[in-house]
Amino acid sequence: MVKRLDPRLLLHGYASGVFPMADSRDTDELFWVEPRKRAILPLQGFHLSRSLAKRIRSGRFRVTADQAFEQVLAGCADREETWINRPIEQAMLELHRAGGAHSVDVWEGE
């Protein structure tokens, strides 16, 4: 179990293919997870479908990067059951402040 998660350790874990989890929001204990399957978004070969392009042009949504990292993280953690506890949240915020974690923020309307 990991007691203190700092940004360097978090980056090292991600680079090694593992990530931290907690059993609940209320615990301070962490463990590392090495998933058998991983999701990869191949951005080099990304194709924008006509329907998605139309939705983007509609102006209904606005997309920004790193404008609301803390709120995005809090939203991800704000669930009845979550794997994001306070130590993970703090480490992610520190990593973001150091330039190593980013958010894609999607806003509906103004």
List each language-model region with its residue ranges.
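N-acyltransferase acceptor-side catalytic subdomain
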Residues: M1-G109
